[in-house]
Amino acid sequence: MNMHSPNEPDAPEVMTTPQPGTAAVTPMMEQFIEIKAANPDSLLFYRMGDFYELFFDDAEKASRALGIVLTKRGKHQGHDIPMCGVPVHAADDYLQKLIGQGFRVAVCEQIEDPAEAKKRGSKSVVRRDVVRLVTPGTITEDKLLAPSESSFLMALGRVKGGSDHSFAIAWIDISTGAFRVAETTADRLLADIFRVDPRELIVAEPVFHDPELRPVFDVLGRVANPQPPSLFDSASATGRIARFFDVATPDSFGTFSRAELSAISGAIAYVEKTQKAERPPLSRPEREEQGSTLFIDPATRGNLELLRTLSGSREGSLFKAIDRTVTGGGARLLADRLMAPLTDPAAIGARLDSVSFFRTETRLCQAVRASLKSVADMPRALSRLALNRGGPRDLGALRAGFEAAGAIVEIFAATALPQELAEAMAAIRALPQALAQHLIQALGEELPLLKRDGGFLRGGYHPELDEMRALRDESRKVIAGLERSLIEETGIRSLKIRHNNVLGYYIEVTANHHAIMTGSDGAKARFIHRQTMANAMRFTTTELAELETKIANAADRALGIELAAFEALTAQAVGEAEKIRAGADALAAIDVSAALALLSESEAWCRPVVDSSLAFEISGGRHPVVEQALRRSGEGPFVANDCDLSPEGNAKNGAIWLLTGPNMGGKSTFLRQNALIAILAQTGSFVPATSAHIGVVDRLFSRVGASDDLARGRSTFMVEMVETAAILNQAGERALVILDEIGRGTATFDGLSIAWAAVEYLHEKNRCRAIFATHFHEMTSLAGKLARLHNVTMRVKEWEGDVVFLHEVGKGAADRSYGVQVARLAGLPEAVVDRAKQVLHQLEEGEVSGKTNRLVDDLPLFSVAMKREAPKPVKSDALGAALGDINPDEMTPREALEALYRLKGLAGK
């Protein structure tokens, strides 16, 4: 979800598009102005021949955004009219750039040809109209879509109920037909939006300008798109839904609240507004119950890097680490599941059963994945066909999907399947076999991109088409065959069939054979005289005239037959949209289960126990992303750790672990890995551990890492406090909370006080399962006061004044953070490190406040800065060379530690 505004550099004042009737311009430009006035918020792609042209301020904006030449066409009020253009055949590439920068584009096509325009008058302008609005949430073109990412359009509905408001969201992926709706609340709204991760959010203008919701839309930036409130009218929603889905009443769709109807109405109305006359094959809106998915707030999603890292890249994310799917639909389903883990243990168990099946049946898993690799993106192909943007390859995608589905049916023919896989196979068996056979029979092997190119129907499928192709491609052979036939019929060995631009095709015989051609009434009827020459006579026949017409029209007729067949196949496919979509969803579910099974086997993951208890017991847990990164870099194995937050004895609530330990010891990794294990388990995946027992988590909160929010005037500490406040105000006993270094962004005693109070509140009020990492070692005394609080620490070893990080979690509390040692590893000057040791020693001897003055007097800062360090003796040339090779600015903590060991070894020689 790109939340930034279009980055338009400062530019000189532009020539804005005038209002209709206010400018003395050409008829063509007047037409542009009128159409632009109806689409003021979009760049207007105005079709002129083989180009889409843009004028006035649209041209200046597009020129900067696309990096194309700005030129001019005509004048307005004495000034040149700016113009730029893009070729029609490359329009998708330019649309991708514009949409990516936050623009919306109105595509204006010619809706009549020039000949028709001339019939209306010599000066008539060809009729044009907008056929489509291209927006971030309504893209269907393959070039503009990432195969593994959904492209959701979301609509926000709000209705008033007394003094309160109720909210709902509806989200559609036009490219696949997916359509869901759910109620939400004002405090959950932003979290639900981030869960769906829409490309575009439409909202009624009064709601968009509501001061109470302003913070939400400020966060979303250009993703939010205000629309007229009439689109969201819940009173007329029922009729709009019925018309769109062509049903008498939508009662069979289920019962929806007024807010849900408002959101559904807004989504459908916007689809109609942007797609004009075309209608995408949307599924019926599926209602999602509140609480059916794990609540994860936006900050936690960002901290855990589920789909993307904090820098916006998929590399390094959890999704990238676990994705082993082989289909676009499977990858999208896996991403959707990661963003919305389940809270129903039975539903989670059904998913895990499917993964377990493939984990056990490895040969079946391999065979199924081999078949799935040939599955193209059926839902997206179907959507393009329905919107009249498809081509032969989209029909080919459906054919490939049907063929793979048939192979998978054969693979599972005599196999008992778990519930989820059995339901998936039922949907696959229900795929329309008549359409499948029709596509297999009709389509050739090599398919063109565009239907207008022809050549996509298989030979033998349509007899007339075969004849037309023969005439088109083998006209000489056909003429030669007719010539031989006429020679045999007349006995004139010198008879020839020739062609010129005046007569077309004709039969030519020498003059002395004219009697054969004209000597009888039958011959006269058969051979029609066309021309007499000095030594020859020319004739035609009805057969030759028909053949000539056929040859002349063969190419057009061949293409016409193929286009008609394309439309018929498309109509048949769109008519089966519901079954095709269900079958494609089933193939995606099978892909996800098989992929997770492969992942669990290759990574040695275990099946978690997920139930309704409050358990949280992980043995040998690992961080899935970090573990793979260590393996790739060859830095050694990941150190697994246990975590047990389960209620103890007669306790009704889960435990809190107070985690202390040094910087670089692995605290943040440990925190994140347990949150990720919970997410993976409730997604229905095996988890990176030797065993795991997790009582369903209903809310997950993570406050790990922070950054400034300068745009809203919030410091790092303020951001930290806002996020911590949200956790303390919302977490219940089923929540899992991971907190890292609360209170570090302010004065020591202030920070300690806040962290101390937060732990007490989590224990006494929230009563949730939690891991709280801190450098405030004074807090470890809370373990004697709070019954469910336990001290754990990241273990280290000290050796000859240096520290070795073991990355192991054990019982107990740390009394030091080893910050000075880490500073040395980072390459701080030796004088700074030595002075830090002195300051630390004196601070640790007594109260800080009683020592600071003496510290300043003992060794002023400038004394350290000006002191020249005596060079230290180097024990060997090897040690000096090794030191010279080290660049501490480019080393990871682990690399620094390994370098330290090497230097120690050299120093001892």
UniProtKB/Swiss-Prot annotation:
ATP binds at G661, P662, N663, M664, G665, G666, K667, S668. Residues 275-295 are annotated as: Disordered. GO terms for biological process: mismatch repair. Transmembrane segments: none annotated. It comes from the Bacteria. It holds the Pfam family MutS_II. One of its GO terms (molecular function) is ATP binding. Keywords: ATP-binding, DNA damage, DNA repair, DNA-binding, Nucleotide-binding. Residues 275-290 have a biased composition (Basic and acidic residues). One of its GO terms (cellular component) is cytosol. The keyword Nucleotide-binding applies. NCBIfam families: mutS1, PRK05399.1. Belongs to the DNA mismatch repair MutS family. This protein is involved in the repair of mismatches in DNA. It is possible that it carries out the mismatch recognition step. This protein has a weak ATPase activity. This is DNA mismatch repair protein MutS. It comes from Mesorhizobium japonicum (strain LMG 29417 / CECT 9101 / MAFF 303099). The gene is mutS.
